């Protein structure tokens, strides 16, 4: 493991052939197989900031293919093992029920997991887990249903299960399904797709501010703001402006240059361009960001509140620092010209991070060759694939996806599977915290943790208090709500709300608190009383529009808005950018309410599936200096009520290659014929047509079905040349 060195010096050494330990031990050689490294050897290939080190917590065979991790109240680590994910280049048997959720325990507190049990066996690619007070919530690939698993005899193996929330089947690409299961400050359980309210063991679903808000992973900060990411949308941190449940805003959130990754592994195994080949194939834009967390640990006071996001293609982890002005946040790379953690090991594939109960930063590393789902990993050249070229930004050379397959096969990467490591990052000279025993503690003991310096302890204690439903904790919570610790005052109020014990007096006192964070939380908590037009709350809010803290004032506006009275804030604080952005959002929503019913249903499909590349406004999402996908708002195929024959073909089979002479960053519009019904595809077309082209008609499922039948035998995506022959 190496401490940070100046990137300019590193780049110069690379070009001069002076870096001796690239990719693995030895010089870069594109004609050899890359060796599999031991955890200790792999750690030596990592760079982290000076004064910090990486430790191995678990590795194969104790853990295999770790795609997601979560701690329970006693510090045990639950791991989703994707034992069928891309076990070969053909994704053979990928949906076979042989994956697992395993439970790892550090029995002696030395920082190494030493006991493993298979908590759940023989399942399909578990995507998310949330260990609670007496159960573990789990979601699996191919379904949105959430299950509750119970370990009645506490032997580390689940004994029974029940449905916590029954969802629909989800046969979309496995990289675009449900993810999350995060207990938030407002006592909702958040996923990337929706929020859930805990109700005595069952879950009640609620929407986010729009459809799917994140791809794989979800994080929260001290004040309940979510940090989202898009893999295909090349965005490690977005939509972090407002607490969960409020509008997701289409505003600029990042500093110039934020989207440039700074990896050090010169392995050209990504297909869609974005490589600086002159710099040994260094990735120039994000492509697979996922697994984010927010650092909320006293071990890292200098980074507290920053977020981490994994980039497995770039073999790096980005740390994002947030600055706030007039209540609006901006994301910055915390290490300009570098990254928080990066590796030269070809098989280092970080996919998930957690801020742990001991205060350390935990990283789940799939440690494998292929991190591309089969849909975007063709292995043979067909006539349709001949046009699937993407342009390298620096050399203007063409490379095909199939050529990428042959490269990685030559390097031996296709056969590196069934490994996996879990690391933790710790500071030199500082002791990690003790392991918790919350599952064995009384409610009174849990209340004391609400003022803990580690955010993980506060969140877990609040979750356990609310999910237990023990109203005997209410007196202690009231005392903490009036105490000296800011975090304690906030969490105690939210715990009281979750237990149905919050009183108006505690809300009104919080609205006058010396801490802006307590005032903001109390304004949010006041919304039920405001909706009932409680005179005391109306009077208190009326005097808070001029709060010196811009985030508090913004929350006051949101409270009036939630009660259907945004006019009560009219003419106040015009300098607040988020207030203006929410008003703009509401104006746009008012127009969408006039859409047809099929278009409104299609909007959900669009926001869950298409928005990460085509953008909320239909103008395309920009990554580095290129759009990921063409602007639908300018599509000639959608003009004049649309060419359904062409549009349905694109949705069903996908489209590849340049469009109008432009090579878009995503490279391929994926086929949707297997994942979406004729009705869903008709509705998403209707939404896009009405939204950006003024269509006066709805596309029918029958129209899509006819095209589906006509092209049933076709293999591979369409090219622009193909579609020209079909369209006018």
Model-predicted segments: where are they?
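Gly/Gly-Pro-rich "capping" loops immediately C-terminal to redox-active cysteine motifs
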Residues: 483, 619-678
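Flexible coil segments in periplasmic/lumen-exposed cytochrome c-class electron-transfer proteins
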Residues: 26-33, 375-376, 583-597, 664-728
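Structural detector for internal amphipathic alpha-helices that build alpha-solenoid repeat scaffolds
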Residues: 433-436, 456-469, 487-501, 506-512, ...
């Amino acid at each position: 493991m190496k401490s940070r060195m100046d990137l300019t010096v590193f780049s110069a050494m690379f070009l001069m052939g002076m870096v001796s330990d690239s990719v693995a031990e030895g010089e870069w050689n594109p004609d050899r197989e890359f060796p599999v490294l031991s955890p200790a050897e792999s750690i030596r290939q990592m760079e982290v900031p000076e004064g910090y080190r990486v430790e191995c917590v678990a590795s194969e065979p104790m853990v295999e293919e770790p795609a997601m991790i979560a701690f329970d109240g006693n510090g045990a680590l639950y791991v989703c093992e994707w034992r069928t994910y891309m076990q070969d280049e053909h994704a053979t048997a990928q949906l076979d029920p042989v994956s697992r959720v395993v439970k790892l325990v550090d029995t002696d507190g030395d920082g190494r997991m030493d006991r493993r049990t298979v908590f759940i066996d023989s399942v399909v690619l578990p995507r998310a887990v949330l260990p609670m007070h007496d159960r573990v919530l789990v979601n699996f690939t191919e379904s949105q249903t959430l299950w509750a698993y119970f370990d009645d005899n506490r032997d580390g193996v689940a004994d029974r299960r029940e449905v916590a929330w029954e969802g629909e089947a989800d046969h979309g690409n496995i990289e675009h399904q449900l993810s999350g299961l995060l207990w938030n400050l407002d006592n909702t359980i958040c996923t990337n797709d929706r929020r859930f309210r805990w109700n005595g063991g069952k879950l009640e679903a609620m929407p986010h501010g729009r459809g799917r808000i994140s791809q794989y992973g979800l994080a929260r900060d001290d004040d309940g703001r979510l940090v989202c990411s898009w893999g295909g949308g090349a965005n490690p941190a977005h939509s972090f402006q407002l607490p969960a449940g409020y509008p997701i805003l289409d505003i600029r959130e990042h500093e110039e240059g934020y989207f440039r990754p700074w990896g050090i592994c010169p392995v050209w195994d990504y297909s869609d361009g974005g490589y600086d080949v002159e710099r040994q194939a260094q990735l120039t834009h994000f492509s697979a960001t996922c697994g984010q967390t927010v650092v909320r640990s006293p071990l890292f006071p200098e980074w507290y509140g920053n977020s981490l996001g994994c980039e497995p293609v770039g073999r790096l982890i980005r740390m994002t620092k947030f600055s706030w002005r007039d209540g609006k946040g901006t994301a910055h790379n915390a290490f300009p010209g570098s990254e928080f953690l990066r590796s030269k090991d070809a098989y280092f594939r970080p996919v998930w991070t957690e801020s742990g109960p001991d205060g350390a930063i935990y990283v789940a590393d799939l440690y494998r060759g292929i991190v591309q789902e089969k849909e975007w990993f063709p292995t043979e050249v067909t006539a349709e694939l001949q046009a699937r070229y993407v342009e390298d930004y620096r050399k203007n050379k063409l490379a095909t996806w199939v050529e990428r397959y042959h490269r990685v096969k030559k390097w031996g990467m296709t056969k590196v599977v069934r490994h996996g490591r879990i690391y933790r990052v710790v500071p030199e000279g500082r002791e990690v915290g003790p392991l918790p025993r919350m599952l064995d503690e009384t409610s009174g003991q849990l209340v004391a943790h609400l003022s803990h310096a580690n955010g993980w302890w506060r969140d877990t204690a609040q979750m356990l208090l609310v999910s237990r439903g023990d109203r005997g904790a209410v007196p202690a919570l009231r005392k903490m709500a009036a105490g000296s610790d800011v975090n304690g005052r906030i969490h105690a109020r939210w715990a009281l709300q979750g237990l149905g014990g919050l009183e108006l007096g505690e809300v009104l006192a919080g609205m006058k608190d010396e801490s802006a964070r307590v005032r903001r939380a109390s304004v949010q908590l006041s919304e039920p009383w405001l909706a009932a037009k409680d005179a005391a709350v109306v009077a208190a809010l009326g005097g808070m529009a001029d709060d010196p803290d811009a985030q508090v004032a913004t929350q006051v506006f949101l409270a009036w808005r939630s009660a259907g009275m945004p006019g009560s804030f009219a003419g106040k604080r015009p300098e607040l950018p988020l207030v203006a952005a929410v008003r703009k959002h509401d104006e746009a929503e008012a127009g969408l309410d006039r859409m047809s019913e099929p278009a409104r249903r299609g909007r959900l499909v669009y926001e869950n599936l298409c928005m990460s590349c085509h953008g909320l406004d239909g103008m395309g999402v920009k990554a580095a200096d290129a759009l990921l996908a063409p602007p639908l708002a300018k599509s000639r195929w959608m003009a004049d009520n649309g060419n359904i024959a062409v549009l349905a073909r694109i949705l069903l089979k996908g489209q590849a290659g340049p469009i109008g002479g432009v090579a878009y960053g995503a490279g391929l519009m994926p086929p949707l014929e297997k994942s979406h019904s004729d009705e869903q595809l008709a509705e998403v077309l209707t939404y896009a047509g009405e939204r950006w082209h003024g269509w006066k008609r709805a596309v029918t499922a029958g129209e899509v079905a006819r095209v589906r039948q006509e092209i049933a035998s076709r293999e591979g995506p369409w090219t622009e040349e193909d579609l020209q022959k079909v369209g006018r």
